[in-house]
Amino acid sequence: MTDWPLAQTFRFNGHSVRFAVRGDGPPLVFVHGTPFSSYVWHRIAPYFITTHRVHYFDLLGYGQSDKIEGDVSLGVQNELLARLLEHWGLDCPDVVAHDFGGATVLRAHLLNGKDYRSLTLIDPVALTPWGSPFVQHVRQHEAAFSGLPDYIQRAIVPAYIRGAIKRDIPDDELAPYVQPWLGDPGQAAFYRQIAQMDERYTREAEGLYPTIRCPVQILWGEDDQWIPIERGRALQGMIPGAQFHAIANAGHLVQEDAPEAIVAALLRFLPFFS
């Protein structure tokens, strides 16, 4: 993904995590989900570099960060985020998170004590139960999937990711999402992160949602086929004062279906805390 450079490296538990910091102004942190990378913000983050100091990174085991054989679960990603916030010297940034990134920022806030000035959650993994039939099957057969022939992997990954996007995305636009999961290290990493999915990591934080200490807005694609919009409305009911905005004509990966809706929501929300 040469068009999405992450030029800086943070060492976490002996492994390399790639990140970028751009712009000047109040700190704004973007956190991606699975099976994606910080590339999901490529149509959104650049818009804010004239008004904010924008931070984004690839989770451990994802994108341009090290694809380790060890723990890349939700149980470690909040520890990584907490350490990164300290490395960046951020005490109370605005935070935007999608999918597993939502679980990560919620855990860092509620379990690691990290404070945010505001929090925007986009189709987050936050309420149990979660996990598609494909995820459940892979969890039971990780070794078999990790050893699939390359041509089958090249069919599975695009089909899986397309399920998160409502529009008919061209192959060249899909490629940056697919490429990190190809080849021996990438294929093993793809099934490793699925095999390590465990609902206990969301259960550990779920009961604490009423104690969230910052303003929250929740954005949800109306046509999300991975996590139904009803889960988003249920999440809103657990967080006092949370705003909820349904995004029309968008699936789970709202960043690809309706990036302008995310930008507009942030432009409405963030100035209240400037």
Segments and roles (model prediction):
Residues N13, H55-A97, A264-L267:
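Active-site loop/oxyanion-hole signature of alpha/beta-hydrolase fold enzymes
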Residues V21-Q64:
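Conserved HGGG/HGGXW glycine-rich cap/lid loop of the alpha/beta-hydrolase fold
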Residues L110, Y116-L148:
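Flexible "cap/lid" loop of the alpha/beta hydrolase fold
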Residues W130-S132, D150-T211:
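Conserved alpha/beta-hydrolase catalytic His-Asp/Glu region
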Residues E173, A205, P228-G237:
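Short alpha-helix in the alpha/beta-hydrolase fold that links the catalytic acid
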Residues I212, I218-W220:
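Short beta-strand/loop motif that positions the catalytic acidic residue
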Residues D223-I227:
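Acidic catalytic loop of the alpha/beta-hydrolase fold
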Residues A242-S274:
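Catalytic active-site module of serine/aspartate enzymes centered on a nucleophile-bearing elbow/loop
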